[in-house]
Amino acid sequence: VYAEAQHGVLTRFDRRSGENIDIQPQPGAGELPLRWNWDSPLVLSPHSPTRLYFAANRLFRSDDRGDSWQAVSPDLTRQLDRNQLKVMGRIQRPEAVAKNASTSIYGNIVALAESPLAAGLLYVGTDDGLIQVSEDGGTHWRRGESFPGVPDLTYVSRLVASRHDAGIVYAAFDNHKMGDFKPYVLRSSDRGRSWISIAGDLPERGT
C-alpha cells in the first residue's frame, strides 16, 4: 500500500510484515531542491506491478516499488518566479499575501498519466499550464503550451489516457484561482500534438 502526504512525502506499507518505510525521491548531490505540490501525482504503471511514477517539478520512475528512483525528465515546468506574477491585477510584494506561506510551492507537476496501451507513453501536466509528452519512457519530451480556448498558465487538473486508443488522451484545466469558472475539457487524438475542446454545453460556471 502506498500513502502520500503534503509536499511529496511518500511511504510504502507492507500489510503482511507491517513494515512502513519512507520512499520519497531525493535530489542528487549538488542538485537544486525539488518542488513538490501539496498533492503530488503518483501513478502505478499498468504495465508492471513494481513500477511507480512520482512527480515534483521533475518526473521520477522506480522499478522496484520505490526502493530506488531514477529521474526521467528535466524540470518540466515554465520555471517562473511566482513573485513576478500578478495577483488581483497587479504584482504584489512577497509579504503582501500568504502565497509563500500556506500554499503549494509554485512550478510543479500536478497531473500525470501513463497510457494503459503503450508502455512508456507518459503525459505530464503542470500548475503553470504545460502538458509535456514522452513516448519513450522519459528519454525525450514534447512540450505543449497553447490549448484552444484555454487561458495561458491555466492549471492542468487532470490527464487521462484512453483505454481504447493509444493515440487519445483527455485533459482538464482549472482556472478558478483567476476568477474563471469555465469548464475546460480537451481531447487529443494524436498523443498530445493537437487538441480540440469537448466542453460542449457544460455549464458556463461548471468548474
Task: Describe each region flagged by the PLM.
Residues V1-T207:
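Beta-propeller blade termini and top-face loops
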